[in-house]
Every structure is written in structure tokens, then in C-alpha cells.
Design a protein with these regions (language model features):
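N-terminal beta-alpha supersecondary unit
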Residues: 1-67
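Surface "functional belts" at beta-alpha junctions
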Residues: 24, 31, 37, 92-199
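Residues at secondary-structure transition points
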Residues: 33-41, 72, 76, 80, ...
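Short amphipathic alpha-helical face segments that pack within enzyme cores
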Residues: 41-45, 80, 84, 101
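Surface-exposed charge patches
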Residues: 48, 84, 181
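Phosphate-handling active-site elements
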Residues: 51-59, 86-96, 111-114
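DPxDG-like acidic metal-binding loop motif
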Residues: 64-98
């Protein structure tokens, strides 16, 4: 029997739940909210997902949860819920970087060349973003640097934002439009893709 994994994402305004049977997603639900209401949405979403798949909690092999960066309250809700399920079912908890999940959204628009560099950006409020650069290996994204919190404004040096070089950069995440706007045309030739991390 293949691994059955419950995936949770609560690091942004978007709250999502997905169930995987091996590599196949058998159920996914996402809600985007104006204000964080994950505490009231998450458990009903998990229950609905399990019912839709015909699974019980005891059928789960592991729970995967976004470990940040992101909203402190959202991360706390997701992590606490995941830990509770893992403890009750005696199954492992898998922590996943929220920015890495955002990087994978690039694959939704088409194939990516091996060696392509993607900058994942997440809104940290005001003129700040969380960011991390990744390189596509053909099978996965490999981190090129650590997660950073940056203030982005019109005078921001592109090298500080994207230390691996700026030619043909792909910027993806819920702060892609904000980053493009704040750079005020300094990022010509870059591709910006707005996306929320999802389970």
C-alpha cells in the first residue's frame, strides 16, 4: 500500500488541505480569506477531505505541514493541528518550507529548463518580503540560499534580492506583484507569477 499523506498549508491568508495516495492527489481544497480564520476552517476542511476520500485518520501514513516562513498565528494553527493528528495516530510529521512550495507553482505554467533559477517571495507586510532562491534540477528544486527577510523599495539592489544573477529571473509567490511594483521597472526581463502556497 502506498503512503497516504495529509498535507496542510496555513502560512498565508490561503488555508488549504490535500490528501495524497502515493504521488496522486486524491482530494484538495483551498480557501482564500480576507482575514485569518484558519482556526475555524482547518478541522472541518480536514474532516471533509477524509470523508471525500473515504479515509479514516487511522489510514494516514504521515502529515505534512508548511513550516514557514509566514503568519505566526497561521503557522501555529497548522503545526498544532498536524502535531495533534500525528500524536493521536502515531505517525510522522513532515515539515516543508513554504517558499519551496511556492517555487513549485512555476511548474503549473509549463515545463521548466534544467538549471532555471526561481525566486520564491512571500508577503511579510509593509515593504518586506520573505524570499529564497531555488534551482530546478529536472526533478526537484534545490535551495541556493537560506530564507531571508528583506525590505524591498525602489532603491533595492537587485543583487540583494536575487544574488544568483538577474537574467531571466522567475519570481513566484503571493508577493510577486508587490515585488514587481516596489522595484518600479528595475527588473526588466523578469517573469512574475502570483501564487499562494498550497497543500
Amino acid at each position: 500500500m502506498s503512503a497516504r499523506i495529509l498535507a496542510l498549508e496555513t502560512s498565508t491568508l490561503s488555508c488549504s488541505v490535500a490528501l495524497f495516495d502515493g504521488n496522486a492527489c486524491v482530494h484538495a481544497e483551498q480557501r482564500c480569506e480576507e482575514q485569518h480564520v484558519h482556526a475555524s476552517n482547518l478541522l472541518p476542511m480536514i474532516d471533509a477531505a477524509l470523508k471525500a476520500a473515504g479515509w479514516q485518520g487511522s489510514d494516514l501514513s504521515a502529515v505534512a505541514v508548511c513550516a514557514g516562513p509566514g503568519s505566526y498565528t497561521g503557522l501555529r494553527i497548522g503545526t498544532s493541528t498536524a502535531k495533534g493528528i500525528c500524536h493521536a495516530q502515531s505517525i510522522p510529521l513532515i515539515a516543508i518550507n513554504s517558499l519551496e512550495i511556492q517555487a513549485y507553482h512555476v511548474l503549473n505554467i509549463g515545463p521548466l529548463h534544467v538549471g532555471s533559477t526561481v525566486l520564491a517571495v512571500m508577503d511579510a507586510r509593509r515593504d518586506e518580503i520573505y524570499t529564497q532562491a531555488f534551482r530546478w534540477s529536472g526533478e526537484r528544486f534545490d535551495a541556493l540560499d537560506k530564507t531571508r527577510a528583506l525590505v524591498i523599495d525602489a532603491s533595492a539592489a537587485l543583487d540583494a534580492l536575487f544574488p544568483q544573477g538577474t537574467d531571466g529571473a522567475i519570481v513566484v509567490g503571493d508577493a510577486a506583484e508587490k515585488t514587481q511594483r516596489l522595484l518600479k521597472g528595475k527588473a526588466s526581463g523578469w517573469t512574475f507569477i502570483a501564487a499562494h502556497p498550497t497543500a
